[in-house]
Amino acid sequence: YQFMKEKNPSLEVVLEKDTKFGKAKKFDDIESKDIISLAINHNDPLCMKVVEKFTENYGTETGNLALKTLPYGGIYLIGGVTSGIQKYMKNDPKFIDAFTNKGRLVEFMRNFQVFIVDSSIEVGLLGAEEKARREMIKHSCGH
């Protein structure tokens, strides 16, 4: 946010002013959810620029990871920021364009599906539960 603010001084900064969208926030009090909310609702040009650039970088790095790991079963994105910008990611081609933009490997990149995991699913707890279940089975069989 601060970087984009310094690089784009002409962009209106709504988040740091009292508006109909809320009270002004000091830089130290700004959270990612504030930036995402104002960006998704097109209420703050700077926040929109931040989310746009983040989404592009996210797509680039996700694509780089795909080339390293070759995830033919798909890539599963999860987390608070991902769930916050999922509508933006689905409606704007920046993520997928950055993901697939790998020179002569563009067509190859289309082999990998990208999924956004619903943030309401407790993935960590489900994983811990599965691990505990496997350990119980292993120990009950005398291994």
Task: Locate each region found by the language model.
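ATP-binding/phosphotransfer module of carbohydrate and carboxylate kinases, centering on a glycine-rich
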Residues: 1-143
